[in-house]
A protein has these predicted regions:
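A Lys-centered signature of the CheY-like receiver
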Residues: 134
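Helix N-cap/capping motif at the beta->alpha junctions
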Residues: 38, 59-68, 90
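Active-site beta3 strand of CheY-like receiver
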Residues: 74-81
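Conserved acidic segment of CheY-like receiver
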Residues: 30-40, 46-50, 79
């Protein structure tokens, strides 16, 4: 994981929004994030980083487990969805969440190693709110999360 953020990669309006957010109380504090990934190393890395920012993480190692958690827990503020998972991949899981979950505005960020042309669009078409590639840069992920949780 890389721990730096390149502001040049952001659109000017998102850059201004993030700079304003950093001046205020952190919108990530006390938020509940569902992290869906079949690789426990990724789950560990993200949950460890989230602890430092007072973010509560709930983990799921499969798409079906994520759907079950969302069915039981209406207090999830955001989902980070790995795309490449066995059985039910992130595309199918995202589509099911969009069809079945009570909060249709729930931000879902696709987290994937797929960085080829068209991969971002495929994630958005499946129902993801946004997209970030692996290896995840924690500061960049946190900034993206702030943008979606601030809305």
């Amino acid at each position: 994981m890389h721990l730096h953020l390149n502001h040049k990669d952001l659109l000017p309006e998102k850059r201004r929004l993030i700079e304003n957010l950093r001046l205020r109380e952190d919108v990530l504090a006390n938020k509940t994030i569902l992290v869906v990934d079949d690789d426990v190393r990724n789950l560990f890395a993200l949950t460890t980083a989230f602890e430092r920012h007072n973010i509560k993480a709930i983990t799921a190692e499969s798409g079906q487990e994520a759907i079950n958690i969302l069915g039981e827990n209406l207090n999830v503020d955001m989902v980070l969805m790995d795309i490449m998972m066995p059985e039910m991949d992130g595309y199918e899981t995202t589509q099911k969440i969009r069809r079945e979950h009570k909060n249709s505005n729930l931000p879902i960020i696709a987290v994937t190693a797929k960085a080829m042309k068209g991969d971002r669009e495929k994630c958005i078409e499946a129902g993801a709110s946004d997209y970030i590639t692996k290896p995840v840069k924690i500061d960049q992920l946190l900034s993206l999360m702030r943008v979606w949780l601030y809305k």
